[in-house]
UniProtKB/Swiss-Prot annotation:
GO terms for molecular function: DNA binding. The lineage of its organism: Bacteria, Pseudomonadati, Pseudomonadota, Gammaproteobacteria, Pasteurellales. This is Negative modulator of initiation of replication. The keyword Cytoplasm applies. Disulfide bonds: none annotated. GO terms for cellular component: cytoplasm.
Length: 197
């Protein structure tokens, strides 16, 4: 992997083209430039690398992964979360808040406070290819670099990175909300606060 420097405008454009959590700059540029994605399949795991064809083949160690079964939420629990999130979205304080990071933290706080177990499962599954988005301590997030700007989600034991653009914040929220089995209509309502007009 090579490192290149780009100006802020180009960086923001590339970041705005992100389609999924964990998508790297290389993945985004390959997609934008219509270049093929290099993949190889090992034991039903897909390994993606821009350097696959450039290096001699190496043995790849694949460790066994224990798949956790996630506990489905009851309709009552889902409805309770939906109600709490909608109450937050409709509050004057939230409506008047201009900072995306404050809105982001407020929504995460409500998700956690309404169903901590479901929130914990959701955040465990949300990680980028090279980055951890949520942790129970600041140090874990700082291991990826001081530039991650970790902040504690108010009234929770969780920390989250905040040096992301609004689009990435929404992808993180969307991933958590989908994992918590919340309806797409609610996710779309939240999305309206994180899209640039």
């Amino acid at each position: 992997m090579k490192i290149i420097e780009v100006d802020e405008e180009l960086y923001q454009y590339i970041a705005s083209q992100t389609r999924s959590i964990g998508e790297s700059a290389s993945d985004i540029l390959r997609r934008l430039l219509s270049l093929p994605v290099h993949t190889s399949i090992v034991n039903d795991l897909i390994i993606t690398s821009a350097e696959t064809d450039q290096k001699p083949k190496q043995a790849i160690n694949v460790k066994e992964v224990n798949i956790k079964t996630t506990k489905k939420q009851s309709i009552t629990a889902i409805n309770q979360i939906v109600e709490k999130v909608q109450t937050l979205l409709n509050s004057t304080e939230f409506q008047e808040e201009s900072k995306a990071v404050v809105r982001f933290l407020a929504i995460l706080r409500v998700l956690y406070r309404t169903n901590p177990e479901s929130f914990a499962q959701a955040t465990e599954s949300l990680q980028g290819r090279t980055r951890v988005y949520f942790a129970r301590d600041e140090a874990t997030l700082l291991m990826a670099g001081n530039h991650t700007k970790p902040k504690q989600i108010p009234d929770t034991p969780y920390w989250v990175i905040t040096n992301t653009n609004s689009g990435r914040k929404m992808l993180m929220l969307e991933g958590a909300m989908q994992s918590m089995e919340l309806p797409e209509t609610l996710i779309d309502e939240v999305r309206s606060y994180f899209t640039v007009n």
